[in-house]
């Protein structure tokens, strides 16, 4: 029997392991680093400018520490003036395609209801750009919004059936009432209904949820499980040799690959 091989996705294109380049986060340098250490995928957050330009940025302000700068409110030209180090998506995809690694895309926007009612789907616009650069079989989308996962899966079924759409489960309950926080956590441990309604074909779960129940559940229903964010050495050792896990996302891809392949 072939040995099970858990895939490794470099969180933020390996930013934490590589460190800053020139005083700022450099996803292009991160892609090169992640490829050199043997990662299978690069994870990155995609945001949408007001003019429809897609950019790679973990933070809403592009990482400059100014809350008055909001990527979604600015055109690409305006963003360049305020946060000149933000990388356009197409530049990153060209660099990623040259390495042969896959793209793990975390959506940081959603299509407004009015736009969706008029027939627009920003997530489908993004998917259309992605498949121009990357083999659809090497694209994974993670999102926690049902309308987003449904529209992505519907589009992929027709245009890119190999693309994976994963429902993201887990996250902060900060600011919620106690009762709402309990309901949220319960729905994360027992997400069957939410998953069915999402039309997703994979699950992306926080490592605690994966270990408590979701690894067993996803194996039972036969869908891939992506686990985030797996950083400690002992946790990497455990999950990288768990046949129930499809992929882990980590800030330390070099160590993860060494533990898996060593």
Region spans (language model):
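Phosphate-group recognition and catalysis centered on beta-loop-alpha active-site segments
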Residues: 1-262
């Amino acid at each position: 029997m072939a040995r099970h091989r858990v895939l490794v996705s470099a969180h933020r294109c390996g930013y934490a392991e590589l460190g800053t380049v020139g005083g700022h986060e450099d996803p292009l340098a991160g892609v090169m680093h992640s490829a050199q250490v043997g990662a299978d995928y690069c994870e990155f957050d995609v945001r949408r400018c007001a003019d429809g330009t897609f950019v790679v940025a973990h933070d809403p302000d592009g990482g400059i520490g100014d809350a008055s700068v909001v990527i979604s409110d600015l055109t690409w030209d305006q963003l360049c003036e305020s946060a000149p180090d933000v990388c356009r998506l197409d530049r990153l995809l060209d660099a990623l395609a040259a390495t042969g690694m896959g793209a793990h895309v975390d959506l940081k926007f959603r299509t407004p209801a009015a736009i969706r009612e008029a027939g627009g789907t920003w997530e489908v616009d993004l998917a259309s750009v992605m498949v121009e650069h990357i083999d659809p079989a090497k694209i994974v989308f993670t999102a926690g919004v049902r309308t987003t996962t449904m529209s992505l899966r519907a589009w992929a079924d027709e245009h890119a059936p190999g693309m994976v759409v994963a429902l993201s489960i887990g996250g902060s309950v900060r600011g919620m009432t106690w009762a709402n926080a309990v309901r949220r956590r319960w729905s994360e441990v027992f997400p069957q209904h939410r998953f069915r309604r999402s039309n997703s074909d994979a699950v992306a779960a926080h490592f605690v949820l994966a270990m408590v129940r979701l690894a067993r559940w996803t194996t039972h229903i036969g869908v891939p499980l992506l686990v985030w964010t797996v950083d400690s050495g002992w946790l990497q050792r455990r999950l990288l040799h768990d046949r129930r896990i499809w992929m882990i996302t980590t800030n330390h891809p070099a160590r993860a690959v060494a533990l898996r392949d060593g």
